Amino acid sequence: MTTERSDPTALALRLLARREYGRRELGDKLLRAGCDAGDVALALDALAAAGYQDDARYVEMLTRTRVRQGHGPLRLRQDLQRAGIEVGADPEIDWLQQAQAVCRKRFGNTPPADARDYARRARFLAGRGFTGETIRQVLGAGRERDFAAD
């Protein structure tokens, strides 16, 4: 009789019933659970062939989640690389609009009051994973030069 620990397919199905996983992430979980590496590879191939595990679907789910959480393209790319997914073309998302919404939610509609406020907002957006160009567009191109005289 095989237990769930020794049956990677059953364990993988239980994990996939809760949420999507990338192939490498799911394989790592199965290996940590004590499953044999050869059995894990076979189980992952079978699950992918049956349509239970799909990296493209995982990328879509992760993209939706990160956008909803207010993260930018750099953070999304980092999360995909961490999950072992080849980073292809950027999804069709208006990152400028996303960054504006995140900034507006955090700081309101007022522009940065001074250089210190500008830097604080820029750090916040950079920490969320937005590019420097997007940050400059959101905070107002040239505004950092206006504050240099302060």
Curated annotation (Swiss-Prot):
UniProt key word Manganese: no
Cellular component GO terms, alphabetical: cytoplasm
Keywords, alphabetical: Cytoplasm
InterPro entries (alphabetical): RecX_HTH_1st, RecX_HTH_2nd, RecX_HTH_3rd, Regulatory_RecX, WH-like_DNA-bd_sf
Residues passing through the membrane, by range: none
Biological process, per Gene Ontology: regulation of DNA repair
Oxidoreductase among keywords: no
Localization, UniProt: Cytoplasm
Alphabetized HAMAP family for the sequence: RecX
Functional note: Modulates RecA activity.
Family, similarity comment: Belongs to the RecX family.
Entry protein name: Regulatory protein RecX
Species, as recorded: Acidithiobacillus ferrooxidans (strain ATCC 23270 / DSM 14882 / CIP 104768 / NCIMB 8455)
Taxonomic path: Bacteria, Pseudomonadati, Pseudomonadota, Acidithiobacillia, Acidithiobacillales
Gene designation: recX
